[in-house]
Amino acid sequence: MKHFLTYLSTAPVLALXXXXXXAGLLIEINRFFPDALTFPFFSF
């Protein structure tokens, strides 16, 4: 039971860190390549 409670306390922390890193990566990509996500849809 102790290991299960440890898992419940660390999994949200790891998910938050992964989500923050993914969001930071998208922010940095959009800083260097602005409108890269919408550019192919409006290039006609």
Curated annotation (Swiss-Prot):
InterPro entries reported in the protein's UniProt record: PSI_PsaJ, PSI_PsaJ_sf
Keywords linked to the UniProt accession: Membrane, Photosynthesis, Photosystem I, Thylakoid, Transmembrane, Transmembrane helix
Keyword check for Transmembrane helix: yes
Chief place of localization: membrane
Gene Ontology CC terms: photosystem I; plasma membrane-derived thylakoid membrane
Biological role: May help in the organization of the PsaE and PsaF subunits.
Protein's UniProt name: Photosystem I reaction center subunit IX
